[in-house]
Amino acid sequence: MGNWGLGIAPWVDGESELEFRRLGMQGPLEALRRREWNTQRASFSFSFLIALSPHTVDYCHSYELFNRRWHGHVLATQRPSLFILMLV
C-alpha cells in the first residue's frame, strides 16, 4: 500500500486540492457549482418512456386473468390493450 495521500490537504467533502486540479477546477465552490449542474442534468436522464408490445401486454393480461380466476375474482374486461408507462 502506497502513501498516496501524503502532502495533500483534504477539503470539507474529503476531496483534495490535487483532485480538484486534476479535474480542472479552482476550488470547492467551482466544484460545487459543477456538481449541482451535473445533478440537474442527470435528473432529466432518469425520465424515459416505456411502451410495451402487444405480445408483452397479452402475456401480462393472461397472467392477471389467471391470477384473478385462481383467487375467484371477476375480470371486468378480457381485451388486452397497449399500456404506456411514464417513469419519472
Curated annotation (Swiss-Prot):
It comes from Homo sapiens (Human). Expressed in liver. Expression is either down-regulated or lost in hepatocellular carcinomas (HCC). The keyword Cytoplasm applies. GO terms for cellular component: cytoplasm. It is found in: Cytoplasm. This is Putative cancer susceptibility gene HEPN1 protein. Keywords: Cytoplasm. The gene is HEPN1.
